[in-house]
C-alpha cells in the first residue's frame, strides 16, 4: 500500500510541476533548454532524422497514416475473431498453410494491440494538428515527429512478431513499454517546444495533449518498475493511466478542437472544460479495469475514484453537445464533426456499462469479466473509431493540404455509429 501511495504522490508532483512550468515558464533557463531540446530533436540520432521531411504538418500526417494502417488490420482481426465466435471451425481449411485456432487468446491480444496502436496513432496525429495550429502552424520538429511515428510502428510490429519465436510475459511487454516511453518523451519535448513558439496562452487541446503524453511516460515507467519489483498495485495504477487517461485525453484534445472549429463558436463552458481536465487526471476511468488489490481499503478508495471518474466524461460530453447547439447545421454538413458529436453522445453510455462491469472485475469477482471485455473493446472500436474518423475527415486534410477525395465519409461515420 505504501508503494502505490508513493507512486501517486510522485504522479501528482510530476503533473503538477509540469502544469506550473507550462503556465509560468522556466525563467532564465528557458532559452538554454529550448536550444538543447531542439538539438536533441533535430540532430539526434544523427543521419536518421534527415531521412524524414520537415515540411509543415508532415509529423501529424505520418502518425495518422500509420494509424490508418493499424486500423484496417485491427478491423480484419476483429472480423475474424467475431467469425470464430460464431463458427469455431471457420477457416480450418487453411490449416495446410499454418492456420490454427485454439481458444482465441492470441486473436484477442492481436486485436487489442493493433486497435490500441491505431487509436493512439490517429488520435495523437489529430492532437498534433490541433496543437500546431494553435502555435504557429507547425511542430518544432516535424521530421522528429515522423521518425517517432515510424519507430512506434516498427516496435508495435515487433511486439506482434516476437511471440511467434519466444514466450512473452508481462515483464517482456513492460520492457517494450519503456521503448514506447522513450518515443513518447521525444513527442512531449516536441510538443513543449511547439508550445513555446508563441506567447499566446496554452489552448485546451494542447493542455490535454501535453498532460496525456506526460501521464503516459509516467505510467509506462512505473509499469516496468512494478513488474521488476513485483508490485501488483503499482502495475494496476500504471494500467489505469495508460489505458484509461491517455486515450481519453487524446479524445478530449481532438473533440475540443474539431467541434468549435466547425461551428465557429468557442467552447460552451469554461468551467466544464476545467472540470474535465482536472478530474480526468486525479480519478480512475471506468475503462479497462483489472483486479486492484485484496486489501479492502484500497478497493474502497479505487471504487470511489472510479465513481468520480465518471464526472470528466459527463462534463466533456455535455460541453461538446452544448457547443454544437451554436451551429448544428455546420456540424451536420461535416462528417468529422458528426463523428465527434456522435462519440460525445455515446461515450457516457459506454462509461456507465464499463463502470458496473469494471467494478465487478476490480474487486476480484470474475462473473462479469467477459462482459467487461466486450464493453471495453466496444469502447475502443466505437468511441475510439468515431474520434479517429473525426481526425481523418476533419484534421488530416489540414495536415496534408488536400480535401477529402470522395463523398463516402458521411456513410463511414454512420456505419461506425450503428455497427461499432
What role is predicted for each listed range?
Residues 228-233, 295, 363-367:
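Membrane-interface helix termini and inter-helical loops of multi-pass transporters
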Residues 2-46, 60-86, 100-166, 174-193, ...:
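Hydrophobic cores of alpha-helical transmembrane segments in multi-pass integral membrane proteins
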Residues 194-201, 261-265, 326-329:
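Inter-helical turn/loop segments and adjacent helix faces that build the functional surface
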Residues 232, 369, 399-404:
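Short helix/strand-bridging catalytic loops that position acidic/His residues to coordinate divalent metals
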Residues 46-58, 62, 326, 330-331:
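Long amphipathic alpha-helical scaffold segments
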Residues 49-58, 82-97:
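Membrane-embedded alpha-helical bundles that constitute the cytochrome b-like, heme-associated redox core
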